[in-house]
Amino acid sequence: MKILKFGGKSLDNGSGILTVLDIIIDNYRAGEAPVVVVSARGKSTDALLALAEQACAGESYEAALQAFWEHQCQDTTLRFEAERVQLERLLSGISLLGECSPRTADELVSYGEVLSSQYVAQALKDRGYEAVAIDSGDFLVTDAHYGSASVFTEASRERCRALFAGLPAGVIPIVTGFIARDEAGRRTTLGRNGSNYSAALLANFLEASLMENYTHVDGIYTANPSVVAEARKIDELYYADAAELSQ
């Protein structure tokens, strides 16, 4: 078994998502039994937070919400009817109260990952492969520290193994990164780099042979190439130096 984790920009509409699908299919055909972990696609998380800000301020958010759904539904047969209703209800509540608590914010941003997993699963089905979208909140159990929750590892491990043991043979699981639920079933998120953490936990729980983390850049750079034009790719790097750079 291999864990394949894909970042948000690599999952965006266009050539990015097509490359992701090719990687998943290649691994499946090679007999790697891939388990896929996905972030929210593109700038979905930023768009959801912007919607919350508009709703909090009592501003009209309908046009921005429509643009959000147009982006999510591009190049897919999915229309996310249930999620549309749920998200509209959530934004209406934020607008009515004029605030977005950390708990509500976790519920709101979770839609980015939920929609992403469904999108990728459907895209694989359209290409003739059996795939299933899995909400990591169905097995990741955390405390109630909304925005940066801590995982209860043993409880999560037990739930994870039970869930995956029940999946049909040959199906490709598409798992949400970043999101979980507390012991009361309320939505939580794992904070910065939460999707990578989710993937690492999954690799540990399922005793995967390997975890591969895919991003939209082709290596480690001296700075963020999206921000610093002069950033250079580092050809060779010791593990200790990589760990230092990640801090």
Model-derived segments and spans:
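Nucleotide/pyrophosphate-binding catalytic subdomain
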Residues: 1-247
